[in-house]
Amino acid sequence: METTNGGSRGYLVSIVMVAVLGGLLFGYDTAVISGAEKGLQAFFMGATDFTYTDFWHGFTSSSALIGCIIGSALSGVLAIGLGRKRTLILAGIMFFISAWGSMCPESMILPVGKPDLTLLVVFNIYRIIGGVGVGLASAVCPMYIGEIAPSRIRGMLVSWNQFAIIFGQLVVYFVNFFILGDHIAPLIQSVGSGMNEIVNGTEAAWAIETGWRYMFGSEMVPAGLFAVLICLVPETPRYLVMVGKDDKAERVLARINGADEARRVLADIKNTVTQKTERIFTYGVMCIVVGVMLSVFQQAIGINAVLYYAPRIYEAMGFDNPMKLTVFNGVLNLGFTCVAIFTVEKLGRKPLLIAGSLGMALGAIGVAFTFGVAELKLLCMISIMLYSVSFMYSWGPICWVLIAEVFPNTIRGAAVAIAVAFQWIFNWIVSTSFVPMANSMGYMFTYSLYGIVCILAAVFVWRLVPETKGKTLEDMSRLWRKEK
């Protein structure tokens, strides 16, 4: 088997492949609603004890975000108390419970197929449980990979988590399309005509009564696989040292790095870890500010305004088949995520973030000045795609890399939790504000604002974010002690 300085590359790769399944589930769970929401809307419009308004539909479509915020906020406490590995096992169990419960919210208690307010509440509880799993995985998966990877390839390996997120979103788009098949056209037609009851005996009826259940239920396959496989990987060496299990830590390090390198890395870890945890501001305020602002900028640059509403945007531009453009954009996103994976250790984190910020600014400003001009709709489409792919080789993967490695060992669990919680909060702010802002202020104002934020993000990275390329996680403790 191929080795890395006496360690097993195959062993390291197998660990990372299992860990990034958490990223795939992150993408899968957040995107599955895109195909299911029309059928779900039509199903609950058949309720007789309440009116399924736009408010209820908006809440149901985004209820998982509540769980994401809760899960990310709890991730630090759990990652410290239970460990990185057991926290990921818990996330896998939550993904599975959510998929099963969302598929069959009646769960042998409520009448099957009878839409009412109680069923809607139960369905949203299951979606929130899945969101908690997403929140835990979004914080702990990159942390786990960052703590187990050798420093020379850490950025590349953590970047695979972002690839898995985008791949999970792409997979569920195809799964949803496969499940709906020929049912999709009559479904959209029925919902679009303001249908208030289930239409029996039509293709739309199957999608309304059953199709959305299959979509949510399909997540049980990767969720079950992740929950089982994560039990087979080791705990991270950094966490093992923090809880006094030096021998176990050395064995894990030896299998990854070889015996000689393992002893050196273990000694370095022990020099910077004198206790399990320290107070969050032990290394000064700037350490936390940098991590939190990385998360805030990743969302404030407005990427989810494109990822969540791409079909709406392309349709507003005047394109006939917005779904095809959305899928094409998704394939491009996957390809440009690979750019980051294979260049992050050569070019460094900061150059990619700055280049991506400027590319996004150019794309956003391009959209601002071409949107709604029929003669320039092709240029507008190119601008949207430039905006999107610039994120995919920069802020998409690199933000996760930096959050996983910029904090010192003894505060990483709590600090990552704070940073990722801010990420989900701003995800919600951007996602819920885009449509009202675009409708009231116009697309020119909205995308000009995103462009300005992108420029501010580039300045922030240039001036305040440390370059972590080639540095060990223990170097971060020494760096922030000097900066304090």
Name what the model sees in each region:
Residues 1-248, 254, 271-484:
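Alpha-helical transmembrane bundle of multi-pass membrane proteins
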Residues 256-258:
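Short helix/loop segments within enzyme catalytic domains
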Residues 262-271:
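Short, well-structured alpha-helical segments
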